[in-house]
């Protein structure tokens, strides 16, 4: 019943209209995949937290990392230390269906999955170094990563990642201290409008380009 409720809510979603129908096509495909993704996510989460006395949902962790002026902020999905990552089919013109099935990573060494390790390192740094877990779920299967089966989630690796996070934060702090205005701050960084983070409505992009003097 819970799955049907979520499926009904997703059917009511109104796809965006400014991306040549890409969002609408994904919406239809994901209506098919959603029940299986939910089932695999539930199975993975039950297995990952089988020894827990209770299950805690998303919380905000906001605390200082040594040597920084501003706090680190992160939001673990479950029990202060775990996160769920869902994987979905992606458009592929070469496939007969028009979509390529989602692939669950076999390790966390890839560029995109390493970003999730950085996220887990933030949990670990702020929750008393509790061992993190990541659950990946798709329409076909699921995979659980823990310190027991993944070197990237072990304490020594996470400690190194936290040091990298601190370097990134320190650079951001230096920029904030050097800039007296928003315009000065934006002038210190170069935007990459091909990056997925800029997948925004045309009006939003037009304003951003205007601010950077590109329009």
Locate the predicted segments by residue.
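Metal-dependent nuclease catalytic cores that hydrolyze phosphodiester bonds in DNA/RNA
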Residues: 1-75
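Acidic/proline-rich low-complexity IDRs
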Residues: 6, 55, 60-61, 107, ...
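General structural signal for secondary-structure boundaries
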Residues: 20-27, 31, 43, 92, ...
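A structural signal for short, well-ordered beta-strand segments and their strand-loop junctions
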Residues: 56, 79-84, 132-136
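Non-catalytic protein-protein interaction segments used by genome-maintenance enzymes to assemble
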Residues: 61-117
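Metal-dependent nuclease catalytic regions and adjoining charged, substrate-binding loops involved
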Residues: 112, 122-215
